[in-house]
Every structure is written in C-alpha cells, then in structure tokens.
C-alpha cells in the first residue's frame, strides 16, 4: 500500500487536506476535505509540477503524460490529471472520495511530487465549447494547491 498527502494552501483563505492511497496496481483512492470555497462545483486536477514558488501558478498544466485533450474522469480521452469537480456545500466545505486508475502513486507515471489544484469555477469536462474547454475545462483561476508527498 502506497500513501500520499497534499496539504492545500491558498492566498484566498482556502484550506484542506487530500489523501491518496493505492494498493498494488489497483486504482488510486483520493479522499479530501476542503474549506473556504464558494458553494457549487470546482474543478479538481493533478497538475504536472510540484512547484509552488509562484503560488499555484507555478504548478504548470494538467498532468498529461499521454498528450491527450482535456476530458471528464470517465472519458477515454482525458488528461491523466483530470479528476472532474468537487461539490462544495452552502457552508463552503467539500468532503469527497473518488477513485481513478490514471493517477498511480508508484512507477513511471507516478503523481508523487506533482501538485493537486482546486479551481475557482466548474470544470466543463471538455464539453463546454469554450476556447479553453479542451485544455483546462474552463475551470477558472487556481484558488488552492498542494504538493503531493509520500506518506510513511
């Protein structure tokens, strides 16, 4: 069993902790709690770089080792880092669990050392017709991020 964690930080008052677990070659389970967000859907992605020297802007594009277009988590054509949306309640918090087979914690495609980012707006899952739909899901600004680190 491989475990990882990302502690989210933000200049906008958003905070949270995201846990990742993977058993062998099974899909990775992602469990998180985030607070300080506006109610509604927020894009949630693994970004390519674990660099926060310039805040969340330094994390690069969505993690996309296969060079595909942006899509929904259940789509065949998607970035590996496309994890869809998290749903934030009226109290500004989100608690969620998801599983995904394209974000392993071990091996050459590992997401350890990369970043997880919560966006200001909903991810249109590549289906919105906006000029950014096929690259970012038109999910808006980066409101919180954290580097995915290995846990003991």
Swiss-Prot record:
The record's free-text note on cofactor binding: Binds 1 copper ion per subunit. Binds 1 zinc ion per subunit.
Record: residues binding Zn(2+): 62, 70, 79, 82
Catalytic activity annotation: 2 superoxide + 2 H(+) = H2O2 + O2
Gene Ontology MF term list: copper ion binding; superoxide dismutase activity
Keyword annotations of the record: Antioxidant, Copper, Cytoplasm, Disulfide bond, Metal-binding, Oxidoreductase, Zinc
Cross-referenced InterPro entries: SOD-like_Cu/Zn_dom_sf, SOD_Cu/Zn_/chaperone, SOD_Cu/Zn_BS, SOD_Cu_Zn_dom
EC numbers, comma separated: 1.15.1.1
Cofactor or coenzyme needed: Cu cation; Zn(2+)
Source organism superkingdom: Eukaryota
Location relative to the cell: Cytoplasm
Induction: By sulfhydryl-containing molecules such as glutathione, DDT, and cysteine.
Disulphide bonds in the chain: 56-145
CDD domains: Cu-Zn_Superoxide_Dismutase (cd00305)
GO cellular component, one term: cytoplasm
Annotated SUPFAM superfamilies: Cu,Zn superoxide dismutase-like
Function as written in the Swiss-Prot or TrEMBL entry: Destroys radicals which are normally produced within the cells and which are toxic to biological systems.
Subunit organization: Homodimer.
Family: Belongs to the Cu-Zn superoxide dismutase family.
Protein name as annotated: Superoxide dismutase [Cu-Zn]
């Amino acid at each position: 069993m491989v475990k990882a964690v990302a502690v989210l930080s933000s200049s906008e008052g958003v905070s949270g902790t995201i846990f990742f677990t993977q058993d062998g070659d099974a899909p990775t389970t992602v469990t998180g709690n985030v607070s300080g967000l506006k109610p509604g859907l927020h894009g949630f992605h693994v970004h390519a770089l674990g660099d926060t020297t310039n805040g969340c802007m330094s994390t690069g594009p969505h993690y996309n080792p296969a060079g595909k277009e942006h899509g929904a988590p259940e789509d065949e054509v998607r970035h590996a880092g496309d994890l869809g949306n998290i749903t934030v309640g009226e109290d500004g918090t989100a608690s969620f669990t998801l599983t995904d087979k394209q974000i392993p914690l071990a091996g050459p495609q590992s997401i350890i050392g990369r970043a997880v980012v919560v966006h200001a707006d909903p991810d249109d899952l590549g289906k919105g017709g906006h000029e950014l739909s096929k690259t970012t899901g038109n999910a808006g600004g980066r409101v919180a991020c954290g580097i995915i680190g290995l846990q003991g």
